[in-house]
Amino acid sequence: AAVAQAIADQYSPKGPSDNCPSSPVSMALALAEKIDILVGFFGINEKPTGSKDPFALRRASLGIIRLVIENNIRIDLSVVINYSVSTYMNFNKKKLNVDDLLNFFWNRLKIYAKDKNISHDIIGAEFSWDFVKLLTKANSLQNFVYTDDGKNLLAGYKRATNILHAE
């Protein structure tokens, strides 16, 4: 029954309003399927460009981000992607720039964070391929910035920066 449910859920989430799978088998299959699609298409240099995304790679990457965050899965995405690349035995690795794929994910994460009302600057202040850890820290930092102490810290930093630029 778990395998049948996982097969039914493997393409979820299909969009921002679709539910993420929550059973371990379903999550594993959905993550594996999406990572394989991204690595495979980036491996043959089929990347989204501008408004063109015929293979729904943006949706797949946002699906991975949502699966990881909404199910509190603590994984290092860069390790998972590098492992996936290594499983392609006859794969022309020269065509696949892993950094391009990781940057693609980073940009998708910034869009996800923006949709969750997390400032771009806050996301940029902390870097981690563990998205759960990253968003937890970003939320904490964003909450702090809006307190009186946070505003005072930013004002002091701005003053110090202006003094240094003036000299």
Where are these regions (language model features)?
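Amphipathic alpha-helical "coupling" segments that flank catalytic cores
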Residues: 1-167
